[in-house]
């Protein structure tokens, strides 16, 4: 049995989409228990495997992250994180304030001893539909080569345990594929990655080939990773708008659009990384999953499923044994 703590109040469409996703999750997974934190006036579910706990406060999207965690002690996000810290829950899921959730993860759930800096990981789509693991996408703007090596180790575990990939191929994001390319960070990181024979390091990868499906894990610093992620999001939205404008521009195009409607919907689904679940803060004493702030019920359900798999696979213990101090 896996038990998850869930923030009912976080996100643009909460609590309705959270309640819908939670209801579907407990119906689909008979080995799942949920502790739901939020406003009792908005709680509508009744299920033997859902425990509800009232919280008098909510962390807003515009709240300053660290201040909110410290001051809003009775918020749904803080109480959710405390349930993971105490061992009452195996992991947690929230679509709320990203900075606040990362702060809750670091200051409440706690970092695994031996992990220098936790990393935010997301699974992004590829042309062939299999996707790739990408980290760090914003937990740490600055990084040292040693941090990127640990990110690779964490990403390797994630790809194996969560995505079911044996001996995942690991690449370093760079401005060229040659070993000597890049700045001091990428050059030194390349050396460290190449020396770690526990990893299947296949070399550098350029941003233009990220979605080709040639690798399973891509490692970079949080500043670069966040920019790449937002660029991909923006590009996908722009392409979608351009396609829509083109289809609606003439009767001929409208007819073609009607014929291709199903195919276009499938294409949009393949490009939507929320299909793979949320982003995960790796390197903590518990699983912390961040669903997209604008998640619908389906995307939040995927994030719940992702946290459940992490609990089943005991990913935190594996990280402790492989990357943490217990490995030393």
From Swiss-Prot:
| Pfam short name (any one) | FA_synthesis
What enzyme category does the UniProt record give? transferase
**Where does it reside?**
Cytoplasm
Q: Which SUPFAM superfamilies match?
A: Isocitrate/Isopropylmalate dehydrogenase-like
GO annotation, biological process? fatty acid biosynthetic process; phospholipid biosynthetic process
The Swiss-Prot or TrEMBL record annotates one GO molecular function as: phosphate:acyl-[acyl carrier protein] acyltransferase activity
Q: In which pathway does it act?
A: Lipid metabolism; phospholipid metabolism
**What EC number(s) are associated with this protein in UniProt?**
2.3.1.274
User: Matching NCBIfam families, A to Z?
Assistant: plsX (TIGR00182)
HAMAP family (alphabetical): PlsX
What function does this protein fulfil? Catalyzes the reversible formation of acyl-phosphate (acyl-PO(4)) from acyl-[acyl-carrier-protein] (acyl-ACP). This enzyme utilizes acyl-ACP as fatty acyl donor, but not acyl-CoA.
Q: Tell me the subunit arrangement.
A: Homodimer. Probably interacts with PlsY.
What is the name of this protein?
Phosphate acyltransferase
Q: Organism, per UniProt? A: Staphylococcus aureus (strain bovine RF122 / ET3-1)
């Amino acid at each position: 049995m896996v038990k998850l703590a869930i923030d009912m109040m976080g996100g643009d469409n909460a609590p309705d989409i959270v309640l819908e996703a939670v209801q579907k999750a407990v119906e689909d997974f008979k080995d799942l228990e949920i502790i739901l934190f939020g406003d009792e006036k908005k709680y509508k579910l009744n299920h033997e495997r859902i425990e509800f706990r009232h919280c008098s406060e909510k962390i807003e999207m515009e709240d300053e992250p660290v201040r909110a965690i410290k001051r809003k002690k009775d918020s749904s996000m803080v109480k959710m994180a405390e349930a993971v810290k105490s061992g009452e829950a195996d992991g947690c899921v929230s679509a709320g304030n990203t900075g606040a959730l990362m702060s809750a993860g670091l200051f409440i759930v706690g970092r695994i001893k031996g992990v220098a800096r936790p990393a935010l990981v997301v699974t992004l789509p590829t042309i062939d539909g299999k996707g790739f693991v990408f980290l760090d996408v914003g937990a740490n703007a600055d990084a040292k080569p040693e941090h990127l090596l640990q990110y690779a180790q964490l990403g390797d575990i994630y790809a194996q345990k969560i995505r079911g990939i044996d001996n995942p191929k690991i690449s370093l994001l760079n401005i060229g594929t040659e070993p000597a390319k890049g700045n001091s960070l990428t050059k030194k990181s390349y050396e460290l990655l190449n020396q770690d024979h526990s990893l299947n390091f296949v070399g550098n990868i350029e941003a233009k080939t990220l979605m080709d499906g040639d690798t399973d894990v891509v490692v970079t610093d949080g500043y670069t990773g966040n920019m790449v992620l937002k660029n991909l999001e923006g590009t996908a939205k722009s392409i979608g708008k351009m396609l829509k404008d083109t289809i609606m521009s003439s009767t001929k195009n409208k007819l073609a659009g009607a014929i291709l409607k199903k195919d276009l919907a499938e294409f949009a689904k393949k490009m939507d990384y929320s299909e793979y679940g949320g982003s995960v803060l790796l390197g903590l004493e518990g699983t912390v999953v961040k669903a997209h702030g604008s998640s619908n019920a389906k995307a939040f359900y995927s994030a719940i499923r992702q946290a459940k798999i992490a609990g089943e696979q005991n990913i935190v213990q594996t990280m402790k044994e492989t990357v943490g101090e217990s490995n030393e």
